[in-house]
Regions:
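Tryptophan-paired
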Residues: 1, 44-145
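Single conserved hydrophobic/aromatic residue that forms the stacking wall/gate
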Residues: 1-6, 10
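Short, low-complexity export/processing leader segments characterized by acidic and small residues
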Residues: 10-13, 164
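Surface-exposed ligand/attachment interfaces on beta-rich extracellular proteins
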Residues: 14-22
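Conserved "repeat-terminator" motif of extracellular CCP/Sushi domains
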Residues: 21-28, 96-104, 151-165
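A short, Gly/Thr-enriched small/hydrophobic beta-strand-prone motif that recurs across taxa
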Residues: 23-36, 316, 351
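Extended extracellular/luminal ectodomain segments enriched in beta-structured repeat modules
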Residues: 27-30, 41-45, 255
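Predominantly extracellular beta-rich ligand-binding scaffolds that present long acidic/polar faces
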Residues: 138, 166-532
């Protein structure tokens, strides 16, 4: 005598016409399928298929006394459904009975395939899948684990499916995001609670090509950690939010290990930098490789990395600007540099181990004499250590420029400039800085030229304190800044002879000079590197 229900089949033992001994025995087990919809639209489940490589699912069961005979085996079971619908964040269940057999062991490979579609859109059919060995599909606390990963009649086994929208990223744990596609970064940037959470960690899992995407709208503030993981974001176009523009308007977190390639920052009237308009956090081991950044506004600030490295907590370290990067001041009185427009604000903001390559160029057409530098436009009591600039600056209007720093009010240590400044209007040009501050263990081989109305000095055009600083420049004999003429060296060999004294002056800075043995050694006789 057999009885069946939707979820179970069992048998009763009967002697003759009188029930003398009634015994229940489960003959089936039950799969419970749990579906959770995390997508914004309502979905329904139309089918679930359980399959295996071998034919392990019997379609028939014959019972004679204590003997069970399974027949007509198949390698799959199907549960068809018509009304299992879920709105956003809803949970639904489906059930499928099956005959458990000894063939189903912990090493049996199973595949669970659910067919789903968006409610009201039959053309949106898709499948989601879970697969693995029985021992891999269940955790150690599960029923099947307690039965040595064998299915047992009369028990229920749960398999869960999560319907997750393809947002382009994966939340690996609370607050930790792995970006896999361009839309992943875009979608995360649109979540203020993610951007302003100090516990947020965003890691790139792939290079991102943003060239076909709409212009990036800068995130107002970022407080978490963005780890580029050595990946590259290419083709990014950034539009100003208000007066400012950057990947972030204010970075109060950490940006590291990220390259922006062929980045465009459209005309800005305030602060502009590819990574951050204003940096109050850390930007480390980041690269700009090709691109164009333009500002036009009174008191604007422009740098390839950041417009303003602002506070005592601000740090730019081991960053590089290379490739065909063009920085342009189209108008206004602007503080601009290859790396940062302004460093510090009467505070000890820091820049360390960073550089500007020779392919980078600067075009100045501002109104009024802004401060322009190969590395930093205006250093306002910030510190600069172990840096260099090889960029070319061309000024078509009046300008105050330095090969490394324009206006300087802070210490510059173990750094050099070996680029070019061409001034086509009035102004002041210094091979290292336009004026001011303290220079220690620095040198300039900058090529300096200008009209008759331009003051040109080998190191600084204004008052400056310098220790073990030298310049090498054809046609320029005046070091400037009330510095002794002995600060000029005749050639690369003479500068190389200064290594010992320069390294003694910068001892403790974390950097040291070494002789350059490369093909560009005539222009760059000494290289700066970490003193490890």
């Amino acid at each position: 005598l057999y009885s069946s229900a939707a979820s179970d089949v069992y048998k009763r033992q009967v002697n003759g016409t009188t029930v003398t001994n009634l015994k229940f025995e489960h003959l089936t087990a039950l799969y419970q399928f749990k579906f959770t919809n995390r997508r914004p639209d309502a979905y329904k489940v139309t089918k679930v298929v359980v399959s295996a490589d071998a034919a392990i699912f019997p379609k028939t069961l014959t019972v004679s006394g204590e003997e069970k005979t399974y027949g007509d085996k198949s390698n799959s079971l199907t549960l068809s459904m018509t009304s299992l619908e879920m709105a956003k964040n809803e949970v639904a269940y489906g059930y499928l009975s099956f005959f458990p057999m000894a063939d189903m062991t912990k090493d049996t490979e199973l595949t669970f395939t659910a067919t789903i579609e968006k409610v009201g859109d039959s053309s949106s059919t898709e499948t989601i899948e879970k697969k693995g060995k029985i021992s891999e599909l269940y955790n150690a606390e599960s029923v099947v684990a307690g039965d040595e990963y064998k299915y047992v009649a009369g028990k229920r086994y749960g398999i869960s499916f999560m319907l997750v929208a393809d947002l382009g990223y994966e939340e690996t744990e609370a607050g930790k995001y792995l970006v896999k596609k361009e839309d992943g970064l875009i979608n995360l940037a649109s979540e203020p609670t993610v951007m302003t959470n100090v516990a947020t960690v965003i890691t790139l899992d792939a290079d991102l090509d943003m060239s076909t995407k709409e212009a990036w709208v800068p995130v107002t503030e970022f407080k978490g950690a963005l780890d580029g993981n050595g990946k590259t974001i290419s083709g990014l176009t950034i539009e100003a939010t208000g007066n400012d523009a950057g990947l972030f308007i204010t970075n109060n977190g950490i940006i590291k290990n990220l390259t922006l390639k062929d980045v465009t920052v459209k005309q800005v009237s305030g602060a502009a930098g590819a990574f951050a308009a204003i940096n109050t956090g850390t930007i480390q081991n980041c690269v700009i490789d090709g691109g164009a950044l333009t500002v036009n506004g009174a008191d604007a600030k422009l740098g390839a990395i950041t417009g303003h490295n602002q506070t005592g907590a601000s740090m730019i370290k081991d960053c590089k600007v290379k490739g065909n990067v063009v920085l342009t001041v189209a108008g206004g009185k602007v503080n601009a540099g290859g790396l940062a427009g302004v460093n510090g604000w009467w505070s000890k903001a820091q820049i360390q181990g960073s550089s500007i390559d020779k392919e980078v160029s600067f075009v100045y057409r501002g109104n009024g004499e802004g401060a322009i530098g190969g590395l930093v436009g205006w250093n306002v009591q910030g510190t600069i250590t172990g840096c260099y600039s090889l960029m070319t600056i061309t000024a078509f209007t009046a300008v105050n420029a330095g090969g490394l720093v324009g206006g300087n009010e802070g210490p510059v240590t173990a750094s050099f400039a070996a680029g070019e400044i061409v001034a086509k209007a009035s102004g002041n040009i210094g091979g290292l800085v336009k004026n001011g501050g303290t220079l220690t263990g620095c040198y300039s081989t900058s090529v300096l030229s200008g009209t008759a109305s331009v003051t040109i000095c080998g190191i600084s055009t204004g008052s400056v304190t310098a220790n073990e600083c030298y310049f090498m420049s054809d046609g320029v004999s005046n070091p400037g800044g009330n510095l002794p003429t002995s600060t000029k060296v005749s050639d690369a060999a003479a500068l190389i002879d200064k290594i010992a004294s320069m390294n003694q002056a910068i001892a403790g800075s974390g950097y040291k000079y070494v002789e350059n043995t490369g093909t560009d050694s005539a222009r760059v006789p000494l290289l700066i590197q970490p003193d490890e």
